[in-house]
Amino acid sequence: MLDTHINEFQYTEISPPLIVNEEVMFGTGQLPKFEEDQFEIKFDNSEQRKFLIPTAEVVLTNLVRKSVIDKNQLQKRFVASTPCFRKEAGSYGKDTKGMIRQHQFYKVELVSIVEPSKCLEELERMSICAEKILKKLRKLKLTV
């Protein structure tokens, strides 16, 4: 799946850290809104709060957070496959009763940085990329 995103769809693979600081979590809106759903990591003698990533999106979007990107350097497309960590202590997922919820799961994340005028076009492109992956997965033979 990653090979397809990289070679066919021209995404740049990023291997993000699984532990991020509080500033990074605020930068993507995970804090304070979803604080109760986060796994905070305690380090000896450290005053800085650290968290396990709830999604690779947190790291991928922070790659450009404090940047002014020249229009000629757009678009930027990132892909990452990571474990994600969430407590899901709040009401998120309340409408999925009966489903088994996990605190750790794996996910492939796509992030595109484009000009505002090209956002809808890029969203459509991302949807097509995801659809192509799903079609490839449907061709896999089930073996037991």
Name the predicted role of every residue range.
Residues 1-144:
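TRNA-recognition modules of translation machinery and tRNA-sensing kinases, especially anticodon-binding
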